[in-house]
């Protein structure tokens, strides 16, 4: 983040923004999708086993091979869905932690209001030391917010590197004639 970004800019964005609720909702939907895909894979595995007990021959071997490749992909895919949910959950957690570390907008607003009040009543420079102290405190708020956001940015990038690489489902038909 640029070192001259006002402290209140960062605070307002993180406090007034949409928050992490949409991330948490997405992670929950992914867990539901994982459960569905996982149950489908288990059910198909059971059906395939039953079918192989009763159906023998070259066509059953071809079908078992195709179904097996698809089931392997579906099983891996369902795990990837769950891994994605975990990554998104962690992103939501990191966002909330960042929000708690950013200086609240009201704190910054109070600082600025007090500076303006002291400036308005600064007869003969009586309030100059207090104004300087509040300005120094404001600079600390800015530095804190920038450091927190820089940490958030690098942590989010690190977490996103753990998103799984999605693979296409396998081709289950080789195109042979018969």
From Swiss-Prot:
Pfam families: PPE. Disulfide bonds: none annotated. The lineage of its organism: Bacteria, Bacillati, Actinomycetota, Actinomycetes, Mycobacteriales. Belongs to the mycobacterial PPE family. This is Uncharacterized PPE family protein PPE59. GO terms for biological process: response to host immune response. It comes from the Bacteria. The gene is PPE59. Signal peptide: none annotated.
């Amino acid at each position: 983040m640029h070192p001259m970004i006002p402290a209140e800019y960062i605070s307002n964005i993180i406090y007034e923004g949409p928050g992490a609720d949409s991330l948490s909702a997405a992670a929950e939907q992914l867990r539901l999708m994982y459960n569905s895909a996982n149950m489908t894979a288990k059910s198909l595995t059971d059906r395939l086993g039953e079918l192989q007990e009763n159906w023998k021959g070259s066509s059953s071997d071809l079908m078992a091979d195709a179904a097996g490749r698809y089931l392997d992909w579906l099983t891996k895919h369902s795990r990837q869905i769950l891994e994605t949910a975990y990554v998104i959950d962690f992103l939501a957690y990191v966002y909330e932690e960042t929000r708690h570390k950013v200086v609240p907008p009201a704190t910054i607003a109070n600082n600025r209001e007090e500076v303006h009040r002291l400036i308005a009543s600064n007869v003969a420079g009586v309030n100059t030391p207090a104004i300087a102290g509040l300005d120094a405190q404001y600079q600390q708020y800015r530095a804190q917010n920038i450091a927190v956001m820089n940490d958030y940015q690098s942590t989010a990038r690190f977490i996103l590197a753990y998103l799984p690489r999605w693979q296409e489902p396998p081709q289950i038909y080789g195109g042979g004639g018969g």
